[in-house]
Amino acid sequence: MSDSKQYIMTAEGVKKLEEELEYLKTVKRREITEKIKVALSYGDLSENSEYDEAKNEQAFVEGRIVQLENMLRNANVVDESEISLDAVSVGSIVKVKDYDFDEIIDFHIVGSAEADPMENKISNESPVGSALIGKKVGDVINVPVPDGISKFEILEIRV
């Protein structure tokens, strides 16, 4: 299965994926191998839930390793020194006024592979992220959301 999709990422995002990959290849693989050995020592595999669970975990981890390797191989890393402060782009940190909640929020615009809404890292492909891309300080955007339309004003763009 060859996936040649390009993954737009920040250098920080690449580093996190590399760290996760290293952890899975070293620590996690070793843990799973040990679980399989212990489960095999119980004998009969036909009713060995520990063995089945360890093999399922192994399959998940190996799948994630393949996914991470592919993402890193096809990463298109955004050079922070080339990020314009004139308009929002991947890598920008955007201070916006959220008119729905009357609050100021900082969004870090990242590629989809490193999006984490809990840390206000939003994908350039998300509704809010894609609406912000290319906009300038002072622009007001209206973004369709499940509850209607959300309104944001761009207050600041930084790296």
From Swiss-Prot:
Residues 14-76 form a coiled coil. GO terms for biological process: DNA-templated transcription elongation; regulation of DNA-templated transcription elongation. Keywords: Coiled coil, DNA-binding, Transcription, Transcription regulation. It comes from the Bacteria. Pfam families: GreA_GreB (PF01272), GreA_GreB_N (PF03449). InterPro entries: GreA/GreB_C_sf, TF_GreA/GreB_CS, Tscrpt_elong_fac_GreA, Tscrpt_elong_fac_GreA/B, Tscrpt_elong_fac_GreA/B_C, Tscrpt_elong_fac_GreA/B_fam, Tscrpt_elong_fac_GreA/B_N, Tscrpt_elong_fac_GreA/B_N_sf. Belongs to the GreA/GreB family. Necessary for efficient RNA polymerase transcription elongation past template-encoded arresting sites. The arresting sites in DNA have the property of trapping a certain fraction of elongating RNA polymerases that pass through, resulting in locked ternary complexes. Cleavage of the nascent transcript by cleavage factors such as GreA or GreB allows the resumption of elongation from the new 3'terminus. GreA releases sequences of 2 to 3 nucleotides. HAMAP family: GreA_GreB. NCBIfam families: greA (TIGR01462), PRK00226.1-2 (NF001261), PRK00226.1-4 (NF001263). This is Transcription elongation factor GreA. It comes from Clostridium novyi (strain NT).
